[in-house]
């Protein structure tokens, strides 16, 4: 059975022997145009951003990748990346080095945290083009008072993604009084679907997950909490993209495209197709 150490050793040996494909060198703009293809990395099973449906890869990030490729005059080769233990690992696997099991890095990766501290410790890449401001929201059904103090939800079924910020918040806050009421799901979108189906009384998930879930619910709706959750530490975060550090010509071109899409209303329209309200990233100015 291959160990992680064994896989690392194998990859290192391949590099030393020059056996890794030329594609591992991320393509700057001229090379992308010469090849006629841009390889764009998105996350696997990350609804509403990227997921498979009917054997086809769909989602907000998939549509955005296609739009960027079209505007560059090339074809989009959209590849799914399985999330690793950290976003730093994902940048290594998806952009500047490649995965240990043969995943070829992309020219461009979407859904990357746009954060100064995060960028500083990942100097192998350039983090660019902030295109959305994500945040968490709470939505409830089955008569749940969504504006109440969370302690009043004791005894109600609360849906969250396993090992997520919402999970840690509901289990650990208020002396753990809600811990036994939390139901775990593999993804935030599945937690939303459970609440939409009446299998949970409330869901704490990203606003994009909640809005897209409502969009596909055939007219069913949950009440969205308007007030802040007490002691909830996450104010939201910007989502951007990444290219390899030596591919800044490509990064500059992508930034011009996303800025134009935001100005023209095309970005807003792209999000509306999934029922998601486009919120510009704070860093976009």
For every predicted segment, state its role:
Residues 6-25:
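N-terminal export signals
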Residues 28-106:
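Extracytoplasmic small-molecule ligand-binding "clamshell" domains
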Residues 37-44, 58, 148-166:
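Short loop->beta-strand "edge-of-pocket" segments that line small-molecule binding or catalytic clefts
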Residues 43-44, 132-137, 217-255, 277-284:
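Periplasmic-binding protein-like
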Residues 65-71, 143-146, 156-157, 162, ...:
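Extended ligand-binding regions for polar small-molecule ligands
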Residues 66, 70-75, 79-81, 129, ...:
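Ligand-binding cleft/hinge of the Venus flytrap
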Residues 78-151:
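Acidic, polar ligand-binding/catalytic clefts
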Residues 108-121, 169-172, 196-197, 201-235:
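A ligand-binding cleft/hinge motif common to bilobed small-molecule-binding domains
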């Amino acid at each position: 059975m291959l160990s992680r150490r064994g896989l690392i050793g194998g990859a290192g040996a391949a590099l030393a022997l020059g056996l890794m494909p030329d594609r591992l060198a991320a393509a700057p703009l001229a090379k992308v145009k010469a090849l006629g293809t841009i390889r764009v990395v998105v996350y696997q099973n990350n609804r509403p951003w990227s997921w498979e449906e009917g054997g086809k890869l769909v989602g907000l990030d998939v549509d955005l990748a296609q739009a960027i490729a079209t505007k560059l005059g090339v074809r989009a080769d959209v590849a799914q990346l399985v999330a690793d233990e950290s976003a730093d690992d994902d940048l290594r696997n998806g952009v500047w080095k490649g995965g240990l099991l043969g995943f070829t890095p992309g020219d461009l990766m979407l859904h990357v945290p746009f954060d100064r501290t995060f960028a500083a410790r990942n100097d192998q890449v350039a983090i660019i083009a902030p295109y959305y401001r994500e945040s968490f929201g709470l939505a409830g059904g089955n008569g749940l008072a969504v504006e109440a103090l969370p302690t009043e939800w004791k005894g109600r079924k609360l849906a969250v993604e396993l090992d997520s910020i919402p999970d840690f918040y509901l289990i650990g806050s208020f002396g753990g009084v809600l811990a036994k009421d939390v139901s775990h799901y593999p993804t935030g979108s599945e937690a939303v679907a459970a609440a939409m189906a009446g299998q949970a009384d409330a869901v704490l998930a990203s606003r994009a997950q909640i809005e897209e879930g409502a969009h596909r619910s055939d007219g069913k709706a949950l009440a969205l909490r308007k007030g802040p959750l007490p002691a909830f530490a996450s104010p939201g975060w910007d989502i951007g993209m990444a290219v390899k550090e030596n591919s800044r010509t490509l990064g500059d071109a992508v930034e011009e495209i996303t800025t134009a899409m935001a100005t023209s209303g095309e970005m807003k329209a792209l999000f509306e197709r999934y029922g998601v309200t486009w919120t510009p990233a704070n860093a976009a100015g």
